[in-house]
Amino acid sequence: IVGQLVEIPVGPKEHRRLIPIITDEYPDPDFGSGAVKITGAHDFNDYAVAMRNAIPLYALMDTKGAMRQDGLPYADSAAIATRAANGEDVGDVSNVNLVPEDLRGLDRYDARKLVIDQIGAEGLAVTYLHKEIDRETGAEHLERRALVDAKPIMQPFGDRSGVVIEPMLTDQWFVDTQRIVGPALDAVRDGRTQIIPDQHRKV
């Protein structure tokens, strides 16, 4: 099946995109099925897999953790992504928005729940039987739930905020501190810049 294309079961059926089945050393065959979907723009490990396998980096979220609203309509974006899955060089994908219209602008957690519900409604989600006991009556309540809800995943959290850190590709700016520090130190040494109070000159 390697090299074949599979449908992502999200979005309008007539416009669903296809992705290639690839092999890579990253997935753990002892965790779940050993198959994973790669979202290179939003996961450190997926980024490495995408780079090794020439998978375009499609951004799905904005800087506030909501699903993107900008870019091309979903149908156009899905068509471009499917061409890329077939090996075509599609160039810059920054305007490609693979978030279906009904999910655009939603908080990532709300969108995730809707995606799970949509996949479940089509009978495509792997499910398990969840049992709850009513504390007052002792009655047992069984409910079928998507297995994805019960699977533990590694997520980085901010050490101060406790909020989930969502990796995303952004422009990075670097400053050549060697070129900046030298003239600044010279200005302090020759008196053009005065540090007040004086004891902080060494800092």
Identify the residue ranges that each predicted region occupies:
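Short beta-strand-centered aromatic/proline hotspots
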Residues: L18-D24
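Short conserved beta-strand and strand-loop elements enriched in small hydrophobics
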Residues: G3-P12
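Residue patterns forming the tRNA-binding/recognition surfaces of aminoacyl-tRNA synthetases
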Residues: Y26-V203
